[in-house]
Amino acid sequence: MKYLDVDGIGQVSRIGLGTWQFGSREWGYGDRYATGAARDIVKRARALGVTLFDTAEIYGLGKSERILGEALGDDRTEVVVASKVFPVAPFPAVIKNRERASARRLQLNRIPLYQIHQPNPVVPDSVIMPGMRDLLDSGDIGAAGVSNYSLARWRKADAALGRPVVSNQVHFSLAHPDALEDLVPFAELENRIVIAYSPLAQGLLGGKYGLENRPGGVRALNPLFGTENLRRIEPLLATLRAIAVDVDAKPAQVALAWLISLPGVVAIPGASSVEQLEFNVAAADIELSAQSRDALTDAARAFRPVSTGRFLTDMVREKVSRR
């Protein structure tokens, strides 16, 4: 495993574990998964050197935090547990109460990394961040982070906090590389981290899905799996497959290896089984050449997906044509 040293947090594994799926019926996991496989996955993650475990108060309405805290056991104080507060009425007293509730569910006195889940479109960070500052000053959290913030808003959060907001968790993958343009350079320059969620684009970068093999369930509603986007992404997938052959790995592992080869970037893929966790963690051992890394970066930047509106229009048209 590779690690980054982060101020206020300590060693953060470059491959972490996203736990949004713990107890999530929408993704087919459910209660049995939560009480069995989830615990096995967390224990195996610790054995493999994973130190970053991401959750949030809204994941399963607190269930993810409870399962994670229970599964970590005595290790819960030895790792970087990252949770998030959803910024509804994000005033200092509310944020403190919500953080304390998350800490109780996680069975922690102190949450190492506490993040604002998304920017509030109405309430500015000058109102939100004083609550985070109070939590830092009281020692209830180790560091403050944000999620889904633009660079401009990240800078405003910094100013409002009066100290560095150490992380920004964003949608980031070869299929969604926007963070390359500004967030990653900022993180490198300012010694921050970018936490990449959905790093495998819901399985698209694993090479399993294509025009002849469409996903079902909620994935089918992801615009990336639309007909035109599956055509447009093929050059990127071809590059990914070719490099995977060169390094004797799978495309999904190369996609993760590309992310964590970038300065200040860590990835938090989910896992539905111990085997999937082991597969993801193995990506940390892949060393990409500069040529391979650049080829993937170029292919990612060249991918131009169609808009959501176009995706929806195409989807309706295709369904009508099948009648």
Curated annotation (Swiss-Prot):
CDD domains per record: AKR_AtPLR-like
EC category: oxidoreductase
* Gene3D superfamilies tied to this protein: NADP-dependent oxidoreductase domain
Q: GO terms for CC? A: cytoplasm; peptidoglycan-based cell wall; plasma membrane
Cite the Pfam families for this sequence. Answer: Aldo_ket_red
Q: What is its EC number?
A: 1.-.-.-
- For binding NADP(+), which residues are annotated in this chain's numbering? S198, P199, L200, A201, Q202, G203, L204, L205, G206, G207, K208
Q: Keywords assigned by UniProt?
A: NADP, Oxidoreductase
| Active site, per annotation | Y59 (proton donor)
Question: What InterPro entries is this protein classified in?
Answer: AKR_Detox_Biosynth, NADP_OxRdtase_dom, NADP_OxRdtase_dom_sf
Kindly list the GO molecular function terms attached to this UniProt entry: aldo-keto reductase (NADPH) activity
UniProt similarity note? Belongs to the aldo/keto reductase family. Aldo/keto reductase 2 subfamily.
> What is the name of this protein?
Uncharacterized oxidoreductase Rv2298
Write down the species.
Answer: Mycobacterium tuberculosis (strain ATCC 25618 / H37Rv)
